[in-house]
């Protein structure tokens, strides 16, 4: 609540400051200039008769990798694809019935971002913002962005962010994402809150730079276990059950939650620097740097009374809680030379403590410990260099001591053939242990207790990717991946498992043979006048000895849309229809106790179309969205599952807006 109050106060201030109108430039809808005369940011630096014209390039957004982009208030089809709860293109995902409930994967990637295992519960934490997802800002005047979208039944989604500079060298931002959706089916309510605040600073002489953020996040979901009579109450299309609260579900008193807090700091100091050359870049620089991160995170499953759906239980009331605390420190030195390139080398220390609140003793006397903890020490290295038209990048994370981490190596080379065509090749290799919930888990449910910390081997992933970016021919990506010791969840029993009882026998397993995965993705838009057809197609093929990795062979999304200025260019309009389809396959099942997906090979799901109709508009810096989602649900058959027993949502109309304003 204190975060919400703080954000509301900041937004109120920003709205008051933002009442000065920002003139719309007489250009096409690319919002390249704000066209506003304003005073310098720092009143102390004010000069007589001084005024400046602000452009969109005065509003910078800086990524974790320190890549800088500018505020974009255009209305494009890509913005339509990203206008959702995750605020990312969900082409390779299949959402569940309620917004934010879970997302089954239609496409998979094996690249590891970090060297260390995660807490787990991956089906529930897609909205949990990792440090690589936090953005930093540098803005000429205070900038506010409001993202709003309706949800299902009660609730809404609001993402508010305020960024402001107190001087040309110091920036602060504060953001809060508040979300609630009751859902159409019983006991599927989802609530989440993501509070973030950031700062970044550069000293007057440019030698010292700092950036930091704090994130406090929680995601809470009711769990209904899926439909109890799906043939009679869903697949039949019986009008008595079109009102979804009448549909019977398996659970009515269960929920799970993820809660985490993170503190992050990264700063550098230039020991040696030379004067700028004619291109305004330093010829040589030598810097030392330090980064720090402390995070606490837990996953909890609660149930007021146990259910046979998950097998036998020790206690009637279920309260399973896995906690992870991590502490990361890195010291590095960075050398830059215009001829030699940029080289970073350093050493890091990672301390972890993953634990439960009790020790579990099995009937045969086997003790399952309640804790995994230790310290890992490793080396880091990064290299960047541009040679002619080639851009080379490489990074290495190498573990010196410890049991968890392995090695991560990424390398890429890109080349611009001309202004319209670019190619890029990437290589990835990594080794590390699976996530903590595969290694150690404890639950009040007897079958959900295991210790694989001394049994499981490190997963080894490698991939080679080639990409073509062409304004003429479209964008093509081809990637081939190998994975050894692939780890997954699946039902395991010496006896035949009855239908609907998979969740009572879920165990973590590790595949001893190599799994190979081919992924080909192509995107191309055809345009004729004001009409356009945007196409994205993905093909996948898996080579494996056992059926442990299931993905659809083909996924396609095609959007036919119309774009034009209307009302004497006072509004820019986009409207169209999106078609999405994926071939039937053994879609992964969902497990509420773990908040994870598991492999099942009993039934194929998929092979159904999804049709959406949208009308979007842009007025100055405001984008308005209106969509009829899955409007074909009532006449294309009731077989649209997102996972076994979990249907996708029915036809629904939703609307919202994204509004940027300045002061």
Each language-model region and where it sits:
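Sec-dependent N-terminal signal peptides
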Residues: 3-12
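Sec-dependent signal peptide cleavage junction
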Residues: 15-84, 276-277
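Exposed, low-structure sequence patches enriched in small/polar residues
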Residues: 18, 114, 139-141, 258-303, ...
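Outer-membrane beta-barrel proteins
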Residues: 42, 51-57, 61-68, 73, ...
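Low-complexity, highly charged intrinsically disordered N-terminal segments
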Residues: 75-131, 138
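Flexible loop and strand-edge segments within Gram-negative outer membrane beta-barrel domains
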Residues: 206-266, 297-307, 314-315, 322, ...
């Amino acid at each position: 609540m204190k975060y919400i109050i703080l954000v509301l106060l900041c937004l109120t201030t920003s709205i008051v400051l933002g009442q000065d109108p920002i003139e719309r430039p007489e250009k096409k809808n690319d919002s390249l200039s704000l066209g506003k005369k304003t005073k310098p940011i720092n009143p102390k630096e004010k000069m007589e008769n001084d005024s400046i014209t602000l452009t969109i390039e005065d509003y910078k957004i800086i990524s974790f990798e320190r890549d800088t982009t500018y505020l974009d208030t255009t209305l494009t089809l890509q913005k339509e694809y990203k206008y959702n709860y995750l605020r990312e293109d969900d082409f390779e995902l299949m959402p569940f019935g309620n917004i934010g409930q879970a997302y089954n994967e239609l496409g998979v990637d094996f690249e590891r971002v970090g060297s260390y295992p995660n807490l787990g519960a991956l089906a529930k934490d897609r909205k949990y913002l990792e440090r690589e997802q936090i953005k930093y800002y540098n803005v000429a005047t205070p900038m506010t962005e409001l993202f709003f979208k309706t949800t299902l039944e009660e609730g809404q989604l609001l993402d508010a962010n305020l960024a402001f500079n107190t001087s040309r060298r110091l920036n602060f931002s504060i953001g809060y994402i508040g979300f609630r959706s009751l859902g159409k089916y019983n006991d599927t309510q989802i609530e989440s809150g993501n509070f973030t605040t950031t700062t970044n600073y550069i000293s007057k002489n440019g030698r010292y730079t700092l950036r930091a953020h704090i994130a406090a996040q929680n995601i809470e979901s009711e769990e209904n276990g899926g439909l109890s009579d799906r043939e009679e109450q869903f697949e039949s299309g019986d009008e008595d059950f079109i009102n979804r609260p009448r549909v019977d579900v398996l659970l009515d008193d269960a929920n799970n939650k993820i809660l985490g807090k993170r503190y992050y700091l990264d700063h550098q100091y230039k020991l040696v620097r030379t004067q700028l050359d004619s291109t305004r870049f330093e010829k040589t620089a030598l810097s030392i740097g330090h980064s720090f991160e402390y995070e606490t995170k837990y996953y909890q499953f609660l149930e007021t009374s146990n259910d046979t759906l998950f097998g036998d239980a020790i206690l009637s009331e279920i309260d399973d809680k896995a906690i992870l605390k991590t502490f990361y420190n890195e010291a590095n030195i960075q050398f830059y030379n215009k001829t030699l390139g940029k080289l970073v080398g350093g050493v890091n220390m990672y301390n972890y403590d993953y634990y439960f609140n009790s020790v579990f003793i099995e009937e045969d006397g086997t003790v399952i410990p309640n804790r995994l903890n230790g310290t890992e020490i490793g080396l880091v290295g990064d290299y960047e260099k541009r040679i002619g038209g080639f851009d080379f990048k490489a990074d290495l994370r190498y573990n010196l001591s410890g049991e968890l981490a392995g090695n991560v190596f990424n390398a890429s080379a890109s080349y611009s053939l001309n202004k319209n065509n670019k190619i890029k090749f990437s290589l990835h290799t990594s080794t590390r242990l699976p996530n903590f919930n595969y290694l150690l888990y404890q639950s009040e449910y007897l079958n959900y207790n295991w210790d694989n910390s001394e049994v499981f081997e490190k997963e080894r992933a490698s991939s080679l990717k080639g990409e073509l970016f062409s304004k003429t021919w479209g964008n093509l990506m081809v990637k081939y991946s190998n994975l050894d010791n692939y780890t997954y969840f699946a039902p395991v029993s010496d006896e035949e498992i009855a239908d609907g009882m998979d969740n009572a026998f879920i165990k973590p397993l590790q595949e001893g043979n190599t799994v190979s995965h081919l992924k080909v993705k192509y995107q191309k838009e055809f345009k004729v006048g004001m009409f356009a057809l945007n196409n994205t197609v993905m093909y996948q093929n898996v080579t494996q000895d056992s059926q442990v990795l299931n993905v659809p062979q083909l996924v396609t999304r095609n959007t036919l849309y119309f774009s034009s200025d209307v009302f004497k260019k006072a509004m820019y309009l986009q409207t169209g229809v999106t078609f999405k389809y994926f071939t039937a396959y053994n879609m992964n099942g969902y497990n509420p106790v773990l908040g994870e997906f598991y492999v099942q090979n009993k039934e194929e799901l998929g092979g159904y179309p999804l049709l959406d109709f949208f009308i979007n508009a842009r007025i100055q810096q405001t984008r308005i969205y209106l969509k009829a989602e899955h409007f074909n649900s009532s006449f294309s058959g009731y077989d649209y599952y997102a996972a076994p027993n979990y249907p996708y949502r029915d036809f629904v109309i939703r609307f919202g807006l994204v509004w940027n304003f300045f002061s």
